[in-house]
Amino acid sequence: MSDYKNTLNLPETGFPMRGDLAKREPDMLKRWYEQDLYGIIRAAKKGKKTFILHDGPPYANGNIHIGHSVNKILKDIIVKSKGMAGYDSPYIPGWDCHGLPIELKVEQLIGKPGEKVSAAEFRTACRKYAAEQVEGQKKDFIRLGVLGDWDHPYLTMDFKTEANIIRALSKIIDNGHLHKGAKPVHWCTDCGSSLAEAEVEYYDKTSQSIDVRFNAVDTATVAAKFGVSAVNGPISLVIWTTTPWTLPANRAISLNAEYLYQLVQVEGECLILAADLVESVMKRAGITQWAVLGSCTGSDLELLRFTHPFMGFDVPAILGDHVTLDAGTGAVHTAPGHGPDDFVIGQKYGLEVANPVGPNGCYLAGTYPTLDGLFVFKANDVVVELLREKGALLHVEKLLHSYPCCWRHKTPIIFRATPQWFISMDQKGLRKQSLQEIKGVQWIPDWGQARIETMVANRPDWCISRQRTWGVPMSLFVHKETEQLHPRSIELMEEVAKRVEQDGIQAWWDLDPAEILGADAADYVKVPDTLDVWFDSGSTHSSVVDVRPEFGGHSPDMYLEGSDQHRGWFMSSLMIATAMKGKAPYRQVLTHGFTVDGQGRKMSKSIGNTISPQDVMNKLGGDILRLWVASTDYTGEIAVSDEILKRSADSYRRIRNTARFLLANLNGFDPAQHQVKPEEMVVVDRWAVGRAQAAQAEIMEAYENYDFHLVVQRLMQFCSVEMGSFYLDIIKDRQYTAKGDGIARRSCQTALFHIAEALVRWMAPIMSFTADEIWNHLPGERQQYVFTEEWYDGLFGLAGNESMNDTFWAELLKVRGEVNKVLEQARSDKRIGGSLEAAVTLYAEPELAARLNSLQDELRFVLLTSAAKVAAYADAGNDAQQSELIAGLKITFNKADGEKCPRCWHYTQDVGLVAEHAELCGRCVTNVAGDGEERKFA
């Protein structure tokens, strides 16, 4: 028996079956870096329309976690897909480098500034620490396959950026948005500083809930408001609070103008309570006997005076919409120095903003004899006892409720009125303009718009000052007596900015005011405050994007961060850009959810369900992590577990196997010489290229809409269903057995070439390492990297008016599936070995029969059987099986007649008819010794 193996066109490629990504990817990264891949892309895209995704800077502290990976990979997919779509999309990664978390780390290392080290030494240590953290995170981000200008990232602590942050503030001041005021701000007594809204977290805390009597100054006047002429005992307005420590700062009692209040007689006294809450107050106070003497509205009681239970002065009843009937008594203790609602209503009534609490959370001297120097949360018990002694305590109980805490220390915070600098929301119409700007932005998903609109509509003025060491200085001079800004503030800030651009923020603290103020130095002092770090990152559209030459003066197209950034970076950027430039800093804002485990639980070290991106890359490789990110609908929570990653690895293998099949069967194909013209190609080959064309249209649209999970789904459908289980299966016979350079094989290779050219581009934004590997194994002259390319424009398909159009092949796919079911059953029953042992008869209704017959003798190649014929549906015998999917089709089979050809494995009657090739079938003889078989359809 002759060996005909060397007459076959066996698949061959250097592209390995196993990805071995964890081992191979680092070598690819080395090559990308050494050859300056990012620079090559920029050169290739120069002059194209731009798309700027501006990187929200992660904080330069600690290792990257799985959430960081999701964020950076999503950004990279967008940047690369925009490149494919014909854009120049530069990506400059950034880091947020100032602020409290870094200060705390450095304090642990060298102590607090002003103790063991000077403030200047402390800042130097902070800068060094932040730089080290940046380098550590950078390595991991690069390992993810994220392409960017990693050698020239932006850092908020770059001298030039620090200077530009000062310039951003200067512009906001020039536009009239800054004001100074004593205002209650979130204050952490451990930090000794105010906190931004985004730095506040809520945890459950047990507090003392108290009902307190404030006695009426003029009993008769108050009684008359209720239509009562005489009462038994004093009248008191009862307030409710869960912060007894704030009572020394009480300056009023707030009522709701529209609520009904009742004067209630209890034993020896009268209480004023909201009518709807009388019963609940009586119940908790243990009062069983009472009588309602009269009623009036809150507005009737406005400006009546009541005595503070222990501070020795009286306070007014005032009206506010913030008073509700959810809990309490309907009367709210009001301390303008300790609450934003209290402050707002206090301004309306001209109340004193009392602030008896120091930065360390202890009462100042002169507050009250038994309270002076006491920490506020320890003072709660003292205040309750004081109220009890004074006969003012109606009731006390423990209450578990959600309470604001410092994100860093996890300890309860307070509202404390401090002299601070604010960007006003309403002084120059910033709120109104921001709300208008939001409408012009595309929010993805669209619920982001309502979310940020609500936040902007309800947010207080933005306190931008901090009392910290490591931060950008506000760079302001104020008058020693009036505390007014220097009239030349804008000019002076530019002078400071120039110095900071040369020497960094230390230049401000080293600056002798006389150097730039001259004679005014005697009357003006430097403001010691630093800027909120959210101002640093929120101004990067100006301090970075506007000045980096790569961006060519274009403003950002997209911001992309986690959904917590509506109140963080998206908000601060919107406020600053609108205050500076009168417009939003972005055109699109895309948000992704947080990572959770396979059961939907938050990632937590204590539960032990965290997954480290470093571990995944070291075990499975970066492309598996990237494919997992792309496969997930990122608009909700993003689930990750070993099982989920294993599924991504399985999907990856299917895609890789498809790519390998394409490459292996392009063996010996030179696209410059061997391409077959579309009109001369076998019909099924044109169909396959057409399926790639249809898939590409959907994939391009999904990339355009940032629906990456749909990209992956379509990619999988194309590889597994259209290619893997149909086309790639049926071409094996032609690919392996047809004449090597005959048109039947070259037609097939032409299709595979076009499909591979398209597929590698679809993959590149997501599975970047593998796409690069495929690119280097594709035949033909090409650019060095797939990442400089655009979507493949060489695809074509079948015309709709052809008889064998897409509809025809879609039906044939179904027919083949039905035949497979019959043959699979026969295999299970051991009636046949492989499908080539079968000769199939398809009994079909006339129209279907005509379509099947149009394939002539090539129907068998589609069905992968040695013979196939079509007969009338009515002629089907009892042994024919009715198709489940196609009403007018029945199927039967027999064992194929003839002998098995050892070369193509088909059973035919013409094996051995040619003496020189006595073992071969006629088709194989033509392919081995003749001009090669002719195929028209399949």
UniProtKB/Swiss-Prot annotation:
The keyword Cell division does not apply. Its main location: cytoplasm. A motif ('KMSKS' region) lies at residues 602-606. GO terms for molecular function: aminoacyl-tRNA deacylase activity; ATP binding; isoleucine-tRNA ligase activity; tRNA binding; zinc ion binding. Binds 1 zinc ion per subunit. It is found in: Cytoplasm. PROSITE patterns: AA_TRNA_LIGASE_I. Its EC number is 6.1.1.5. SUPFAM superfamilies: Anticodon-binding domain of a subclass of class I aminoacyl-tRNA synthetases, Nucleotidylyl transferase, ValRS/IleRS/LeuRS editing domain. A motif ('HIGH' region) lies at residues 58-68. Keywords: Aminoacyl-tRNA synthetase, ATP-binding, Cytoplasm, Ligase, Metal-binding, Nucleotide-binding, Protein biosynthesis, Zinc. Zn(2+) binds at C901, C904, C921, C924. L-isoleucyl-5'-AMP binds at E561. It comes from the Bacteria. Its cofactor is Zn(2+). Belongs to the class-I aminoacyl-tRNA synthetase family. IleS type 1 subfamily. IleRS has two distinct active sites: one for aminoacylation and one for editing. The misactivated valine is translocated from the active site to the editing site, which sterically excludes the correctly activated isoleucine. The single editing site contains two valyl binding pockets, one specific for each substrate (Val-AMP or Val-tRNA(Ile)). Catalyzes the attachment of isoleucine to tRNA(Ile). As IleRS can inadvertently accommodate and process structurally similar amino acids such as valine, to avoid such errors it has two additional distinct tRNA(Ile)-dependent editing activities. One activity is designated as 'pretransfer' editing and involves the hydrolysis of activated Val-AMP. The other activity is designated 'posttransfer' editing and involves deacylation of mischarged Val-tRNA(Ile). This is Isoleucine--tRNA ligase. It comes from Yersinia pestis.
